[in-house]
Amino acid sequence: MIHPDPTLFGHDPWWLILAKAVGVFVFLVLTVLAAILIERKVLGRMQMRFGPNRVGPKGLLQSLADGIKLALKEGITPAGVDKPVYLLAPVISVIPAFLAFAVIPMGGEVSVFGHRTALQLTDLAVAVLYILAVTSVGVYGIVLAGWASGSTYPLLGGLRSSAQVVSYEIAMALSFATVFLYAGTMSTSGIVAAQTSTWYVFLLLPSFLVYVTSMVGETNRAPFDLPEAEGELVGGFHTEYSSLKFAMFMLAEYVNMTTVSALATTMFLGGWHAPWPISLWEGANSGWWPLLWFTAKVWVFLFVYIWLRGTLPRLRYDQFMAIGWKMLIPVSLAWIMIVATAHSLRTTGHGGWASGLLIAGTVLTFGLAVILWRTMRFRADRTVPARTAADVFPIPPIPGRAGTARTPESRETTDA
């Protein structure tokens, strides 16, 4: 197992840095094309229908065809928009999505034409904070798109998105605090190295669950896709966008999904380390093999995105905000105190801290699941209150019949 040497960063030749940057870009673009196609295929199977199956063998070129179609369509700019901001908003959304992936470790040390280098573009002492900061910039593009469109629905979608990111990024940052505490670093390569023996998903299960929930809300995906709710806001912040500008918003969304999935892999699933029992093979974590394990873990999270979209209905806005502020943030704060206590026992030489942390995390997770289930069941089982006199309205008398009062129920029966 060869972990990257921190001194390697910043000493690669220029052509190798350029090659790694192009490699990261190609990896993200290919992942987006594959994710769109697989999402449509999987959703088709979930809904008992065929997915795209016309362009290319078994529809494999459908995503490429859609991208070319959007690029060649006429770009329509509606009247009344703030044109400079309207055109700049998609760019502001898509650039931070790519920049955030620069510090994600995709593997250990490899040899490229005789040069030893890490499968990571660069690393920082505060790499995770860099990712949080850069991904937060992307929401400015959404807000500006809603404001510059000069329409009510896009503006509401932009405001929803800003509130959503602020709410769920707090919970996401709190879920990272426990990882920093145990890894002793905010460097992404250092966090991966700290998980050589045990992945943090087992030690820090509540943090992992909080992060997974937050990352779905952060990327505006179902069931948290409130900024672009079709039934309420038509298309949300990108209602007035078409052609390549619309494609840039879609590209930013799927790149963000890939980035937060890669971050979850790095923080909780051991990064590029091979899973058990593959890790028993001596060469599993050397050479180019770690890139395969890393990609497989990222695709597990991307499938979770697809699964959630195909199975869960969209939440109401008040329910969504209540989950963030009333559940995720308080649970994260309580869990940080528990983890800090266990970490203190660890540093002072007391045994049993790992077992205690596992038990505490399991109990907390189970308790939250029970509370959430009981809450949802109580809401579903509530009886509808009896209608008051205000709900009953008179109707004109029918010739030959006495005047009656008609209720909404009787109207539905009559109309049927």
Swiss-Prot record:
GO biological process, one term: aerobic respiration
Topology with respect to the bilayer: Multi-pass membrane protein
One Pfam family recorded for the sequence: NADHdh
UniProt keywords, alphabetically: Cell membrane, Membrane, NAD, Quinone, Translocase, Transmembrane, Transmembrane helix
GO cellular component: plasma membrane
Keyword Heme included in the entry's annotation: no
EC numbers, comma separated: 7.1.1.-
Presence of keyword Transmembrane helix: yes
Gene Ontology molecular function: NADH dehydrogenase activity; oxidoreductase activity, acting on NAD(P)H, quinone or similar compound as acceptor; quinone binding
Compartments it resides in: Cell membrane
Lineage top rank: taxon: Bacteria
Reactions accelerated catalytically: a quinone + NADH + 5 H(+)(in) = a quinol + NAD(+) + 4 H(+)(out)
Residue ranges crossing the lipid bilayer per the database entry: 16-36, 84-104, 124-144, 165-185, 197-217, 260-280, 288-308, 320-340, 353-373
Protein function: NDH-1 shuttles electrons from NADH, via FMN and iron-sulfur (Fe-S) centers, to quinones in the respiratory chain. The immediate electron acceptor for the enzyme in this species is believed to be menaquinone. Couples the redox reaction to proton translocation (for every two electrons transferred, four hydrogen ions are translocated across the cytoplasmic membrane), and thus conserves the redox energy in a proton gradient. This subunit may bind ubiquinone.
Record's subunit section: NDH-1 is composed of 14 different subunits. Subunits NuoA, H, J, K, L, M, N constitute the membrane sector of the complex.
Family statement drawn from the similarity comment of this UniProt entry: Belongs to the complex I subunit 1 family.
Listed NCBIfam families: PRK06076.1-2, PRK06076.1-4
The name this protein goes by in its record: NADH-quinone oxidoreductase subunit H
Annotated organism of origin: Mycobacterium sp. (strain KMS)
